[in-house]
Structures are given as structure tokens and as C-alpha cells.
Swiss-Prot record:
This is Pre-mRNA-processing ATP-dependent RNA helicase prp5. It comes from Aspergillus clavatus (strain ATCC 1007 / CBS 513.65 / DSM 816 / NCTC 3887 / NRRL 1 / QM 1276 / 107). It catalyses: ATP + H2O = ADP + phosphate + H(+). Residues 793-943 form the Helicase C-terminal domain. Its main location: nucleus.
Length: 1192
């Protein structure tokens, strides 16, 4: 119902002004009447005066309380109901007078009359503005504006007896109306029961229960009666027991009631549900206050109910005056204790909650009218009670019809109900039932509800979503739809991204790079005055520095001449670097001048500091890094150990210069390195493989090379060999072209120089002490021994070293060729009592790092390693290096021996050679000669023997430098190992790619075999002549022939020469047109090679013949093998045979100086022939030649 100035706040907002004005006007008359009548505080007072009296009660006027007690004493004559009223009065006194009615609504105690006086005024305003004129006209004349004393005397009877009589008359009238309403509701209920009869057999039992309870006034869930506000005689109670008795007779006898208090059944509450719907609120509105007060544990265990307005609703319903309440049923307390069966809580979130909140608000408004006279209470609450009772009747019927399982007793057992089933049932019922007009009307009223009243409703709606989220069908469908269908696609994408570790090529013409400064060096005056001759003599003094290039700066002699900052000079002084070394004195000015540099110097000569100091100056000149910008200085190394050592050398300078460096290498967790790079770092020390991984990680968002302007390649010869050169060049291609690039190494073969110069621009080459020279401080010992005597000799060397007390803290490093040999030697030395460890590429990176740290710290004195530790390992106490297995080339020997004798210290390098390793003796002897040491006689014999074999063509001279075996071989080995693991621990997913590859390879072989069979069949179709091949085996053994030479002791008689020539001609004519496999028909003459082989290609398809004869493929083979390839003979169609004087069938002649070169060339030609045959077979299969029909 709409109210004028309606507000849910206790403060009189709507009518305060008018009420107070009328109260002041009538104040004198009111005091006079109160003096005339001692009962001046009775309820027949006008609303205006009562409103004024409330203010006085709050301040100092206390006679009101006495009159209230007197009024309650007057009620005590009623007997049983007076006890109820006494409890209500006590509750009122204990209630808080706070302004927050919402707090009162959610309060857990049942004391509800804290704002009695305010509620009087609120109810008074409500009744004044009510649209219900019918009830208003029936009120006493004391409600009118006429305040004459006669009306006051009439409205305020002097004795209780006439008032009680008037009350009885009105109750009789209300009973008649109630009976008429019950009949109307019974008819409506029967109609709805007939509509719900189609629900099936499960509802037939419920219909019986409904029919049984149809005669009871409690079936429609009317409001439980509350004690009337005025006293009454005991006479009407007898007739008011009948509805209760009827209700008890209609309800089935409880078979196993669950008692809470005396006879109160525990309501069934969904355990998992966090909220109650409006149906629960409607049903629980029937609970009397007595039942609630006797069962505090139930509501306290569900204290969140108060947040949804349910607790307040129960209290309010127990208090409010209704049409039934004013009837005064006799033992109404026992009636209150009887609980009705609760409906199943639905999971609706819309209309019903709003209705419940609004009805709760209405109930509270009705509560406020209790302080008035009984007539005013009844008139004000009648309309609300009728609406509420009708709505509760309909909702209870709806809830009962929705019950799937009938209850056999009147009580409700406390069982946990399945929420999902309840939700489904209630959804069906909501669809079946039409929208009730009263519900629609109350929904409209809910729009005008103040925010305080709707707060509980909003909270209820938020909570109510939880069961839907857990058990809703729609969410389940969504969860099923996501992720399942595309799982294979995601895995395929992930595998594809994982396999493709590639970085995009940058088009530098389209990128705008920031300008930067390279040149920081200003030549000091004393160096500028130095002549060229003086500079040359200075370089000669500094270990014979050799320079190549244009405008090479003169070498410096002091750190102060390098143009460094104060911080860098302080660090250098703190580290104890007195003066620059030879490579530093020449390299630092050259790099600081902005030039590209190739620096070659002996091991342990300070090359690392030579490129680090200019880099710090280079970085500090540029602006700081922004977020997600890559490094400025990039240092690449071939091994992880060298990367960690360079990073360690950087640290003293980083803190002083406020720079950051990241060491990125394989084997370590990449996530840590990604985190460091995202935080920002001006310097990155890395290995090429891990750097490519980082550049490709996360679609290139981890780091980039746009800010890189200073690049260092340490151990550059190893970086540019066959293994690392593709990776290094891929990284270099993504760096700006005008960068400054520096290359350093202790060894730099000539064949590596051409590759390195591709990455440099007009470089300055600085060589100190030779390209690949062992430092003169190292004593080199080379011994030729059998394999079984090497270990005994090793024990002897170690024993001699550690027998001297001066070498107690010495370290020994033993190099072997293979990882298995390292572990085997470790086992043998441990048995002999030497504490040692091994390090090689097969170990985890963390083990390698910890092993080197322990070795440097002296935890164990002996370290067994492969060549992975040959570069960059710097141990000051290392005095002995043993090459247990001889190094396979000069550079490796130099680096191995260079682990000792560092920074001016002395050391010893012992090398064991076996008779089978004479190939490696050449490089070792060369190293001994270049370092000024004598070559042992056994070693020299091995060198001479090997050189003779090379001249005879039996051996091939070993190439200088690290001729790496390439990354493809490593990838193949890793893939093979991974495939073995996958086959061993197969889960059904991993092996699919490998199986597909195997299938493809099998299909290719099958196609080739088919094509080859056609070639063989064509050859077999030809007439068989002597020497014609019956089949060609491209995968078979290659036959290489030595070229025939004239006998040394031939006769000088001309007739003999003529005879031999004639015989040769006849022999050749007899073989005309015939060429057996591997036998040439003409391979003589001055240009003939020492070895030759032939390959007939006449009967192969045209694509196959083209593959082995086109100029591009032949040129590649010629460059790779150094052989001569000639196409000879003539092509003959299948089935045609060359005549006696005709050329032989088309074939290829391969000539070379060594058998190995010819074999390699033949193998490559056979591979091309095989690929061409397969391609021809595929094209024939795709486009068959000829049609289906022939023209006759």
C-alpha cells in the first residue's frame, strides 16, 4: 500500500511538522482533560497528543510508564494472555532505542518493542493517510479533529467493563468476516487442487492431506494470533478453541516427532543452501514468537538467515496485529508452538525475494501500531493481514503441490535435502503456476522500498547464486565445451612452437635506430708525440705485438692513458691491476676508438679485461634502459663455464658503475634468466644456443637486440667453426649493422679468419706472441706410450707432484677425449686414493658449476675433464695439466696447456701419445717448435712417418682449427635418444611425430624401389650382350679403380711400342659400346686422375639424369671433394643397344687424386640419382601419361 511520506526510518519524517503543530495547539486542552480524568493516559487519546506525549516520555515525563503498567495490569485480568503480554512488555523495556531499524530487524533476541512510542506515531501517520476509508470510518470518534470533552469522555470509558463489551461485539463481527473469507479460500483451494491433480500419483497423497486440512483455519497459513492490545473477558475463548482443535484433528499423528522445546517440530532446512526464497519466508511467517524463543539453537546455527530478512520476518509476524490475532483464540501460545511443514526452498532470485523484503517491511510497520488502542490496531492491520493471509495461503498451497515425496506426519524431519533436485522441482512449479496478482502488486510496491530494507535482499541475491554456480546445468555445459575439443590443437601448436626455435629476420632499413657514440679515446700528448719507429719498438717490447689495419692507435703504458672514468679506475686499483698487459695496452685504445678488433693473444694474458673495460665506457655513454628494452652489450662464448667466468669478472665493475649483467647459458633454468632479463640488464653474457632460445621465447617479448651496439665474441675461432657459425650469424643478423664488434681468442686459424671478417667492418687485427702459441712459462712434456702404460705413468706424475710439500695446495687437471673415459679414469683414481671429480658435457649444469667451484676452492686437487674445460678455466694454483688422450689439433692443445702457467706463473703440460695417434703428433710438434722447446725424438719419428703417408695418399693431413661436426649431428643424436626414451616410456602421444617420419621414410624407399625395378626391367628387356649390367645398386659398395700406368721398364724398341699400341686399339675396339659397372673405357692420358669410378645413368628417368648432370649440383660436388666429374657416352632409348662403333651408354666418370675423394663424390652422385628417381616416380603417379582410349 502506498503511504504518504512513507519512510522506514523510525524518525517521523512525513508528518512531524503537522503533528507537532496540532500538538502545540491542543496542549492546554489536553492537560485539562488529563486533570479531569485520572485515566488520561488511555489509548483513546488523539494521535496528535500521543505523539506529543512520546516526546515527553523520552525526556522526563514518567507517568506514561505508570499508565502503561496500569493498562497491562488491566489486561492481567484476562489470565493466560496476560502472561504473554507481560513477556512482550519486558521485551520492550530491554529493547534499544537506536535509529537503525534494520539492525532491529536482524536482531537475534526476540525483544521487539524497543520503539513502541515511535511506532505509535508511525502507525498513526499511516492510518491517517491510508486509502482504506472503509476501516477508517469505523474508528472511534477520538480519531477526528474535534477535541471536545464529550467525545473524549465517550472514547475513554471510566470502567473496564464497557470497553470489554465493545470489544466482544467487534470480535463477533470479525469472526463472521473471517468465516466468509475461509469459505472463499476453501473454494479457491479446491480449484487449484483440481488444476494440480495432473501432477501424477505422487500428488494424490498430498491432495488428501490438503483436503483433510482444508477445514482448519491454519491451512492457509494465517498469521498466528498475538495477544490483543486491550483486555477481554474469558467468555470468547471457548469458541476460539475450535479452529485449533480442528487443525489438530486434521493433522496426522506424528510417528516420530523431533521435539525442540515442548512440541515444536524442527523445520527442514536445505543444508547446502545459503538463502531462502520467498516461499520459505511466507511459510515461516506462521511461526509464533513462542516457538522461536524456545528454539534458539536452530536459528543460531543458521544465523545468516537474518541477513535475508527471515529472522526479522519471524519476529515481526509474531508481533503484528492481524485479523486473526484480534479474534483472540484461547490457548494461542500452544497454537504458536505448532509449526507448519516448510516448503522446499527454491533457488529463485527475482520476484519472491523482493516480495519477502517488502512484506517484512510491512510487518514492521504493523508492529508499530501495537501501542494504540485495540480499535486502531485492528483497523490499521486488517487490510495488511487479509492480503498477507491470502498470499500465504496461495504460496503454501503452491509449496505443498511441489512436494515430490509426501510426509507421513505433520512434522518435518531435519534431513539434508539435495539442493539440485529441489531447485529443479521449484523451477518446474514456477513455470506451471501463473503469476499471482497479489505478488505482482507487491513487486510494484517493492520498488518504493528504502535502501535500508533492500540491503538484506541484495545480500540474499548475491548469496543465492552460489548453488546455481555449483549445480546449474548451463554452467556444466560451458565447462564441458571449453578445453576438450581443442586440446589436440593446443598441444600441436605448443609442440610446433617448441620445435621452431627461430627468430625473425630484421629488416634494418625499416628500423630507426638511435644514434650512439663509439669513439671515446683521445690520444695522450706523450703518445701523440711518439714517432712510428718508437711505437714499433714499444710494441716489440710488449711481447712482440703485431698489428694489421689502418690508423692503429699506439699502445698505452698506464691505465690513466685509457680515458676511463674514476669509478672504473678505482675498481682496477682495488683488483690490483698495476699496468695493462700486452693485449690490453693495444686492444683498449683500439676499441675505445670505435674500431672493430680481432685480438689474438696467449692464454692467461688478460683478454677478458681488454674487452670489458671499453664496454663499460660504451654503455655509460648511452641513455638508461627503458622498460622491456634489451641489452646494450652482448658477449657470446662457446662454453657455459667461460660464460660464468666472464660474468664473474664483470661483477666488481657492475656495482661501482650501477650496471646490471645477466649470464644466460643452457642447462640452467630458463625461467630465472627470463626473469632477470625482464627486470632489465645492460650486459648479457651468453652462449649462442640459449640466446636464440631467449630471443624466440614468448614470441620475442622476453628480450630483443634493438639496443645492442657492442658485441664481443670470446674464443672467436670456436664460435665460427662449423658448429656455431649458423647460430652466431643468425644472432648477428638481428643486431644493427653499425654496431661495434670485437673478437678475441688465443688461437685463430687462417681458415677461420675469412668467416670472422664477415661480421666485422674494417677491423684492426692484434696478435700478441703468435697465433697459436703456448706460453713460454709452460714446460711441455710429450711421451709416446702404449695404452696400458698410460695410467701407471699418470700415477707416477701425480705422486711426484704431491710428494713435494711445496705443492701441497697444487691442482692437477687431466684431459680425456670422451665422457666415458672421464668417468672410467675417475673410478680408477678414486680406487688409488686420489680425491678427484670429473666434468664433461653429459653432466647437469649445476653439477658442472659446483665441481669447478670445489676445484678452485681446493676441496679436491684433481679434476678430470673433457675439452669443455679447456677454455676460460682460470685456476691460480693449477700447476699440472695432463693430456691423457692427445688433443686432435693444435688449437685444442694450446688451450689445454694454457690452463696452467697463467698470469706469469709457471706450469707443466704432459701429453701422452700412442702409436695410433701419429696424426696428432704433427700439431704437437709444431706447438713445441713455436714455443721454442725441443721436439722429442719418438715424436719426431711419428711426424715423419705420417707425412710420408700423406705424400703417398694414404693419409689426409688434418686441418687446423676446430672443424666442428655441425649441429645437425648433435640434433640427430638428441632426437634418437629422445625417441628411445619415448618408446620406453610411451604414453600414447609422444611417438606420433616419429612414427609419421618413419612412415614417410618407408614410403620414399618403397617408391624408389619401384622406380628402380622399372629401370632394371628396362635394362633386362634389352638384348643381353657381354658386360651389360643386369641391375644397378645405388646403395651398394662403390668400386674405385687405380689408374693404369705404363710399366716402368718398358722396351725402347719402336716396334714394341707400335705393337703395344695396336694391341691396345684392338682391345678397345673389341669393347666398343660395352661398359661394365666400375670399369672405364677411357681413363688414360696425362690428365687422368690417380683413382676413378664410373656410374651408368642411361636407363634412369630424365629427372634423375638431370639431377646428376646439371651444373649447379656438379659444381657443389667438385668444390666439396676436389674431384673431376665428366659426363660421357650417349643416351640410348630403352631397348636400344649401341653398335660396335658407337659410343657407350650415358655414364659419369669421376676422377680424383685419392680413393676417399672419389668415394665421397660417387656417394653424393648416387644420392642425387636416388632423389631424382623418387621425384620422377612421384610426378608420374600424379599425372599419368596417356589417355584411356586409342584412335584406331
Amino acid at each position: 500500500m502506498a503511504r504518504h511520506g512513507d519512510t522506514r526510518s523510525p524518525s517521523p519524517v512525513g508528518s512531524t511538522y503537522s503533528s507537532s503543530r496540532r500538538s502545540r495547539r491542543d496542549d492546554d486542552r489536553y492537560e485539562k482533560s488529563r486533570r479531569e480524568d485520572g485515566r488520561g493516559h488511555r489509548r483513546s487519546r488523539s494521535p496528535e497528543r500521543r505523539y506529543r506525549d512520546r516526546d515527553r516520555d523520552r525526556e522526563s515525563y514518567r507517568r506514561r510508564d505508570r499508565s502503561l503498567d496500569r493498562r497491562d495490569d488491566y489486561r492481567n485480568d484476562g489470565g493466560y494472555r496476560s502472561n504473554r503480554r507481560d513477556r512482550s512488555r519486558d521485551r520492550r523495556r530491554s529493547r534499544d532505542r537506536g535509529d537503525d531499524r534494520d539492525h532491529r530487524r536482524r536482531s537475534r533476541d526476540r525483544d521487539y518493542r524497543s520503539r513502541r512510542d515511535d511506532s505509535r506515531d508511525k502507525a498513526r501517520r499511516r492510518t491517517d493517510d491510508s486509502a482504506d476509508l472503509k476501516h477508517k470510518s469505523r474508528r472511534d470518534d477520538s480519531r477526528t479533529r474535534d477535541l471536545d470533552s464529550k467525545s473524549r469522555d465517550t472514547s475513554k470509558p471510566s470502567t473496564p467493563a464497557p470497553a470489554a463489551q465493545t470489544e466482544d461485539e467487534k470480535r463477533a463481527e470479525r469472526l463472521a468476516k473471517l468465516e466468509a473469507w475461509k469459505q472463499k479460500q476453501a473454494a479457491e483451494k479446491e480449484r487449484k487442487q483440481r488444476e494440480a491433480a495432473a501432477a501424477g500419483g505422487a500428488r494424490s497423497i498430498l491432495e488428501e492431506i490438503d483436503r483433510k486440512s482444508g477445514l482448519s483455519p491454519a491451512v492457509g497459513s494465517p498469521k498466528s494470533p498475538v495477544t490483543p492490545t486491550t483486555d477481554a473477558t474469558p467468555a470468547p475463548y471457548a469458541g476460539k478453541f475450535d479452529p485449533k482443535a480442528i487443525k489438530r484433528n486434521a493433522a496426522p499423528t506424528p510417528s516420530a516427532p523431533l521435539v525442540l522445546g515442548n512440541d515444536v517440530a524442527v523445520p527442514q532446512i536445505a543444508k547446502a543452501s545459503a538463502t531462502f526464497s520467498s516461499m520459505n519466508n511466507h511459510a515461516q511467517a506462521n511461526k509464533p514468537a513462542a516457538a522461536l524463543s524456545t528454539a534458539p539453537s536452530t536459528l543460531k546455527s543458521k544465523r545468516n538467515v537474518g541477513g535475508f530478512g527471515l529472522g526479522a520476518k519471524q519476529v515481526a509476524d509474531a508481533e503484528k496485529p492481524s485479523a486473526v490475532k484480534t479474534l483472540g483464540f484461547g490457548e494461542e501460545e500452544s497454537t504458536r508452538k505448532k509449526l507448519e511443514r516448510l516448503p522446499t526452498p527454491p533457488l529463485e532470485d527475482g520476484k519472491d525475494e523482493t516480495v519477502a523484503a517488502d512484506m517484512g517491511a510491512e510487518d514492521e510497520d504493523d508492529d508499530m501500531q501495537d501501542g494504540e488502542t485495540e480499535e486502531e490496531n485492528a483497523a490499521a492491520a486488517r487490510a495488511a493481514a487479509e492480503r498477507r493471509e491470502e498470499r500465504l495461503q496461495n504460496e503454501a498451497l503452491r509449496a505443498q503441490s511441489s512436494e515430490k515425496v509426501p510426509q507421513t506426519n505433520g512434522d518435518v524431519e531435519m534431513n539434508d535435502a539435495p539442493i539440485q533436485a529441489e531447485a529443479e522441482n521449484m523451477e518446474v512449479d514456477v513455470e506451471e503456476e501463473d503469476v499471482d496478482p497479489l505478488d505482482a502488486f507487491m513487486s510494484e510496491l517493492a520498488e518504493s522500498a528504502p535502501p535500508k530494507k533492500t540491503f538484506g535482499t541484495k545480500f540474499s541475491k548475491a548469496k543465492e547464486q552460489q548453488p546455481e554456480a555449483m549445480f546449474g546445468d548451463e554452467n556444466d555445459v560451458d565447462l564441458t565445451a571449453v578445453g576438450e575439443g581443442d586440446a589436440d590443437d593446443f598441444l600441436a601448436i605448443a609442440n610446433k612452437a617448441k620445435k621452431k626455435k627461430d627468430i625473425p629476420t630484421v629488416n634494418h632499413e625499416k628500423v630507426e635506430y638511435e644514434p650512439f657514440r663509439k669513439k671515446f679515446y683521445t690520444e695522450p700528448s706523450n703518445l701523440a708525440q711518439m714517432t712510428d719507429e718508437e711505437a714499433a719498438s714499444l710494441r716489440l717490447e710488449l711481447d712482440g705485438i703485431k698489428v694489421r689495419g689502418v690508423d692503429v692507435p699506439k699502445p698505452v703504458q698506464k691505465w690513466s692513458q685509457c680515458g676511463l672514468g674514476v669509478q672504473a679506475l678505482d675498481v682496477i686499483e682495488r683488483l690490483g691491476y698495476e699496468s695493462p698487459t700486452s693485449i690490453q695496452s693495444q686492444a683498449i685504445p683500439a676499441i675505445m676508438s670505435g674500431r672493430d678488433v680481432i685480438g689474438v693473444a696467449k692464454t692467461g694474458s688478460g683478454k677478458t679485461v681488454a674487452f670489458l673495460i671499453p664496454m663499460f665506457r660504451h654503455i655509460k655513454d648511452q641513455r638508461p634502459l627503458d622498460n622491456m628494452e634489451g641489452p646494450i652489450g652482448l658477449i657470446m662464448t662457446p662454453t657455459r663455464e667461460l660464460a660464468t667466468q666472464i660474468h664473474k669478472d664483470c661483477k666488481p665493475f657492475l656495482k661501482a658503475l650501477n650496471l646490471r649483467a645477466v649470464c644466460a647459458y643452457g642447462g640452467a633454468p630458463i625461467k630465472d634468466q627470463i626473469a632477470d632479463l625482464k627486470r632489465g640488464a645492460e650486459i648479457v653474457v651468453c652462449t649462442p644456443g640459449r640466446m636464440i632460445d631467449l630471443l624466440a621465447a614468448n614470441a620475442g617479448r622476453v628480450t630483443n637486440l634493438r639496443r645492442v651496439t657492442y658485441v664481443v665474441l670470446d674464443e672467436a675461432d670456436r664460435m665460427f667453426d662449423m658448429g656455431f657459425e649458423p647460430q652466431v650469424m643468425k644472432i648477428m643478423a638481428n643486431i644493427r649493422p653499425d654496431r661495434q664488434t670485437v673478437l678475441f681468442s688465443a688461437t685463430f686459424p687462417r681458415n677461420m679468419e675469412a668467416l670472422a671478417r664477415k661480421a666485422l667492418t674494417k677491423p684492426i687485427e692484434i696478435i700478441v706472441g703468435g697465433r697459436s702459441v703456448v706460453a713460454p712459462e709452460i714446460t711441455q712434456i710429450v711421451e709416446v706410450r702404449n695404452e696400458d702404460t698410460k695410467f701407471v705413468r699418470l700415477l707416477e706424475i701425480l705422486g711426484n707432484l704431491y710428494s713435494d710439500d711445496a705443492n701441497e695446495d697444487a691442482r692437477s687437471l687431466i684431459f680425456v677425449e670422451r665422457q666415458e673415459a672421464a668417468d672410467a679414469l675417475l673410478r680408477e683414481l678414486m680406487r688409488k686414493g686420489y680425491p678427484c671429480m670429473s666434468i664433461h658435457g653429459g653432466k647437469d649444469q649445476i653439477d658442472r658449476d659446483s665441481t669447478i667451484e670445489d676445484f678452485k676452492a681446493g676441496i679436491f686437487p684433481v679434476l678430470i675433464a673433457t675439452s669443455v674445460a679447456a677454455r676460460g678455466l682460470d685456476v691460480k694454483q693449477l700447476k699440472l695439466v695432463v693430456n691423457y688422450d692427445a688433443p686432435n689439433h693444435l688449437e685444442d692443445y694450446v688451450h689445454r696447456a694454457g690452463r696452467t702457467g697463467r698470469a706469469g706463473n709457471t706450469g707443466t703440460a704432459v701429453t701422452f701419445l700412442t702409436e695410433e695417434q701419429e696424426r696428432y703428433s704433427v700439431d704437437i710438434a709444431k706447438a713445441l717448435k713455436q714455443s721454442g722447446q725441443q721436439v722429442p725424438e719418438p715424436v719426431q719419428k711419428m711426424v715423419d712417418s705420417f707425412l710420408e703417408k700423406v705424400k703417398a695418399g694414404k693419409e689426409k693431413a688434418s686441418a687446423s682449427g676446430f672443424g666442428g661436426k655441425g649441429l645437425e649431428r648433435l640434433d640427430q643424436e638428441r632426437d634418437a635418444a629422445r625417441n628411445r626414451e619415448r618408446r620406453t616410456y610411451k604414453t600414447g602421444e609422444e611417438g606420433e611425430d616419429e612414427e609419421e617420419k618413419e612412415d614417410k621414410a618407408e614410403k620414399a624407399d618403397e617408391r624408389f624401389n619401384k622406380a628402380l625395378s622399372s629401370v632394371q626391367s628396362a635394362a633386362a628387356a634389352a638384348p643381353t650382350l657381354p658386360g651389360v649390367p643386369k641391375g644397378i645398386d645405388l646403395d651398394g659398395k662403390i668400386t674405385v679403380h687405380r689408374t693404369e700406368k705404363d710399366p716402368a721398364g718398358t722396351s725402347k724398341n719402336p716396334l714394341d711400342k707400335v705393337g703395344s699400341a695396336v694391341a691396345d686399339i684392338h682391345a678397345r675396339l673389341s669393347r666398343a659400346g660395352v661398359m661394365r659397372s666400375g670399369v672405364p673405357i677411357d681413363n688414360r692420358g696425362p690428365d687422368a686422375g690417380a683413382y676413378h669410378a664410373t656410374l651408368e645413368i642411361n636407363d634412369f628417368p630424365q629427372k634423375a639424369r638431370w639431377a646428376v648432370t646439371n651444373r649447379t649440383n656438379v659444381a657443389k660436388i667438385l668444390e666439396a671433394t676436389g674431384t673431376s666429374i665428366t659426363t660421357k657416352g650417349s643416351f640410348y632409348p630403352p631397348g636400344k643397344v649401341p653398335g660396335p662403333n658407337e659410343n657407350a651408354k650415358l655414364y659419369i666418370l669421376v676422377e680424383g687424386e685419392t680413393e676417399l675423394a672419389v668415394t665421397n663424390a660417387m656417394r653424393e652422385l648416387m644420392r642425387l640419382l636416388k632423389e631424382g628417381t623418387i621425384a620422377a616416380a612421384d610426378s608420374d603417379a600424379r599425372a599419368p601419361v596417356g589417355g584411356r582410349y586409342n584412335v584406331v
